[in-house]
Amino acid sequence: MSNVPADLKYTEEHEWIRTEADGTLTVGITDHAQSTLGDIVFLELPEVGKQVTAGDAVGVVESVKAASDIYSPVSGEIVEINSAIVDTPDSVNSDAYASWLFKIKLADGASTDKLIDAAAYGKLID
């Protein structure tokens, strides 16, 4: 069974989301996603300042097995990317939940209602 921290929210597309004290959301891919993909060799992340809509493809994760889109879990503005992880994409394999990809500020009126909790995500990947 994959590691599914209870304090995070998730998407059905295998992204994890942590709400920060300032209200921004930190986004990464789940342990299940990295395990399924295998050794990650390349990450393409969104540009800071980009306005995105929930469900938009905002980046790409490439492994030795496959390439997969990274989706925005909510509508908002990309406010930061983890540029260090672009240089060491394999760190996602080592610790998916410490290896965040980008931070997003919710758009006015946007919500996190469609995100799922750890229990629901655990059932999804069982």
From Swiss-Prot:
Keywords: Lipoyl. Belongs to the GcvH family. Pfam families: GCV_H. InterPro entries: 2-oxoA_DH_lipoyl-BS (IPR003016), Biotin_lipoyl (IPR000089), GCV_H (IPR002930), GCV_H/Fam206 (IPR033753), GCV_H_sub (IPR017453), Single_hybrid_motif (IPR011053). SUPFAM superfamilies: Single hybrid motif (SSF51230). The glycine cleavage system catalyzes the degradation of glycine. The H protein shuttles the methylamine group of glycine from the P protein to the T protein. Transmembrane segments: none annotated. GO terms for biological process: glycine decarboxylation via glycine cleavage system. Binds 1 lipoyl cofactor covalently. This is Glycine cleavage system H protein. It comes from the Bacteria. Signal peptide: none annotated. The modification N6-lipoyllysine is found at residue 65. GO terms for cellular component: cytosol; glycine cleavage complex. It comes from Burkholderia multivorans (strain ATCC 17616 / 249). The lineage of its organism: Bacteria, Pseudomonadati, Pseudomonadota, Betaproteobacteria, Burkholderiales. Residues 24-105 form the Lipoyl-binding domain.
